[in-house]
A protein has these predicted regions:
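N-terminal signal peptide c-region/cleavage motif recognized by signal peptidases
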Residues: 4-6
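A cross-taxonomic marker for long C-terminal extensions/tails that follow the last structured domain
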Residues: 10-27, 98-163
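Acidic, glycine/proline-rich low-complexity segments that act as flexible tails and inter-domain linkers
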Residues: 18, 23-25, 34-38, 75
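Acidic/histidine-rich, surface-exposed loop or edge segments in extracytoplasmic proteins
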Residues: 39-55, 89-90
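Envelope-exposed proteins and targeting segments
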Residues: 42-46, 81-85, 115
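Solvent-exposed, acidic/flexible segments
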Residues: 52-62, 80, 101-102, 143
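Histidine-anchored nucleotide/phosphate-binding helix
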Residues: 59-78
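Acidic helix-start/capping segments at beta-turn-to-alpha-helix junctions
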Residues: 80-97
């Protein structure tokens, strides 16, 4: 019991977390020794669901989770071309895909798009917040809805990441 309370009282240490090897400035992760291994033959097709908007000037943590997934798996030996990711964005988070001076996510999104990560906006949320397709960061896709996007992704072999 004492041991458990000591563990609970400890603050997490993020010293082992670092970005890279794919995204040098974001997507920090830590190596894990002795865990279930990943193999160079593993393949991933994963959809991330993001509805929470970032604080002004900050990176969207949901978007960065997708970058973390790529960084940690490539660092563990999975080839980058074995990883297909889509970030389905709805709710206020669609505003993090509109370019602008105060958008702390824009540079990250643009770099992730260059690496083949898809960003898919819920058209229903975009309509609610007055965001048109031509107002989005170049390369971001607009679908009828987030529900539609997830259904279509699942039909092509994507799983949904619950984190």
């Amino acid at each position: 019991m004492l041991f458990a309370s000591q563990l609970a009282a400890q603050s997490p240490s993020l010293d082992a977390f670092a970005p890279g090897p794919v995204f040098a400035d974001f997507g920090p992760h830590a190596p894990v020794e002795g865990g279930q291994p990943v193999a160079p033959t593993d393949r991933f097709a994963i959809a991330f669901d993001v509805a929470q908007r970032a604080d002004e000037g900050a990176r969207n943590r949901g978007f960065e989770s997708a970058a973390r997934f790529i960084n940690m798996h490539v660092a563990a030996g999975v080839p980058e071309d074995h990883i297909r990711l889509a970030v389905v964005v709805h709710g206020k988070a669609v505003l993090d895909l509109v370019p602008g001076e105060n958008n702390g996510s824009q540079a990250m999104v643009e770099e992730m798009l260059e690496h083949g990560v898809r960003f898919i906006v819920c058209g229903q949320s975009a309509a609610a917040y007055g965001v048109s397709t031509d107002a989005l960061i170049d390369g971001v896709e607009m679908h009828l809805s987030a529900m539609t996007a997830h259904a279509k992704l699942q039909q092509t072999g994507f799983t949904v990441n619950p984190f």
